[in-house]
């Protein structure tokens, strides 16, 4: 294991705990007399202007669309390294998280529809449990970081990022009312420029980040989730330079402390404050929250593990070294933490309908994600190697 990865795991252990603490603080504030202060903080207007271009958004969206793009940049860098040189190198190993992610989207959606398919309003939320909150899933795993094999963490990263990309496509196809073709065209041009820079051997990460910032603006204006820009830039920054140094690893090393100690805890604080006003005991067993919760803590592991197991048995994919099927199952349960991505889809699915749909969908997401987090953590403790 490289020194950078060792440092990353150490950072995550502390950062994961900080993430959970800030999430709890946010949940308390959102359901207490401090709710007003919490909402005022998230709704602070932040404007950035460059010539004729102006982006004016509340702080919450700057955190979710802007700062989280940096997190996804690091995820892209790490997954690329493992695909080229690490535990996912080779077609059969690289296919493994792809197949797992497909199962992790299909099964929860089907289970949700078993509960809600007959209701014309609630069935619009079929994609809610398809999402995995990569930040919170990593945060829980980070609590056991010294025992987690690098290969298992990379599997979670790869699976979750493919899952998120799939959800972004779902949002674009089924939940985006207006898409700017001009902005999409400019996004494609920026991606082409990044590909050309990589092909020409440009090694300066500052050049990639500059083009990446423009790409981020273009994707934001297109109506597609802007964090996609971070993944794209991460995959296109060169892994190895001409003199043997690694531009991508140097960038990872510089950004990791900021992500672990600032960006992810701030993200948790901004998004975990789910207000539960108007919730009743009878509503807890309604088909909407129940369908979401069951789809997350049961559908996710069912889909991920079954698709993974079958792909291995038929020889279509190969289990990465140093990890076993018990650990894969534990991680698949952890992927049931849908949380912020699920809440985002919920807002799109039930936009313009009665507020109770939004309240009870958030409740279902909170229940399912919490159960998945505790179950996933408990299973990981059981199946991971003991400390030496």
Curated annotation (Swiss-Prot):
One of its GO terms (biological process) is regulation of pH. Keywords: Antiport, Cell inner membrane, Cell membrane, Ion transport, Membrane, Sodium, Sodium transport, Transmembrane, Transmembrane helix, Transport. It is a multi-pass membrane protein. Coiled coil: none annotated. The chain crosses the membrane at residues 8-28, 33-53, 59-79, 95-115, 125-145, 154-174, 179-199, 217-237, 259-279, 287-307, 328-348, 363-383. Gene3D superfamilies: Na+/H+ antiporter like domain. It catalyses: Na(+)(in) + 2 H(+)(out) = Na(+)(out) + 2 H(+)(in). The keyword DNA damage does not apply. The keyword Cell inner membrane applies. Belongs to the NhaA Na(+)/H(+) (TC 2.A.33) antiporter family. This is Na(+)/H(+) antiporter NhaA. It comes from Photorhabdus laumondii subsp. laumondii (strain DSM 15139 / CIP 105565 / TT01). The gene is nhaA.
């Amino acid at each position: 294991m490289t020194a950078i990865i060792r440092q990353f795991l150490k950072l995550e252990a502390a950062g994961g705990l900080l993430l959970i603490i800030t999430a709890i603080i946010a949940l308390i504030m959102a359901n207490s007399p401090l709710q007003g202060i919490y909402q005022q903080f998230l709704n602070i207007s932040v404007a950035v202007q460059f010539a004729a271009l102006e982006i004016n958004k509340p702080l919450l969206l700057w955190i979710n669309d802007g700062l989280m793009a940096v997190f996804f940049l690091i995820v892209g860098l790490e997954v690329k390294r493992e695909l080229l040189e690490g535990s996912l190198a080779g077609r059969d190993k690289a296919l493994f998280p792809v197949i797992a992610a497909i199962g992790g989207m299909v099964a929860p959606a089907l289970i949700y529809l078993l509960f809600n398919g007959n209701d014309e309003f609630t069935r619009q939320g079929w994609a809610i449990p398809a999402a995995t909150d990569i930040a919170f899933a990593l945060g829980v795993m980070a609590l056991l970081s010294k025992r987690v094999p690098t290969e298992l963490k990379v599997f979670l990263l790869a699976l979750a990022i493919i899952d998120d990309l799939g959800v972004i496509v779902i949002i674009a196809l089924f939940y985006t009312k207006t898409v700017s073709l001009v902005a999409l065209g400019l996004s494609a041009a920026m991606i082409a420029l990044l590909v050309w820079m990589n092909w020409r051997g440009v090694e300066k990460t500052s050049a990639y980040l500059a083009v990446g910032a423009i790409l981020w603006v273009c994707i934001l204006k297109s109506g597609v989730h802007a964090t996609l820009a971070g993944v794209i830039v991460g995959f296109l920054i060169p892994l190895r330079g001409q003199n043997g140094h690694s531009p991508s690893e140097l960038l990872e090393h510089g950004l990791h402390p900021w992500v672990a100690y600032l960006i992810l805890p701030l993200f948790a604080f901004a998004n975990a404050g789910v207000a539960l006003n108007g919730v009743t005991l009878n509503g807890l067993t309604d088909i909407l929250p129940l369908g979401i919760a069951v789809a997350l803590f049961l559908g996710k592991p069912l889909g991920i593990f079954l698709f993974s197991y079958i792909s291995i048995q038929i020889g279509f994919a190969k289990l990465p070294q140093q990890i076993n099927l018990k650990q894969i199952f534990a991680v698949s349960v952890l992927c049931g933490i849908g949380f912020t991505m699920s809440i985002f889809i919920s807002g799109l699915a039930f936009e313009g309908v009665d507020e109770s749909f939004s309240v009870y969908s958030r409740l279902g997401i909170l229940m399912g994600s919490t159960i998945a987090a505790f179950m996933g953590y408990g299973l990981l403790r059981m199946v991971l190697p003991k400390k030496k």
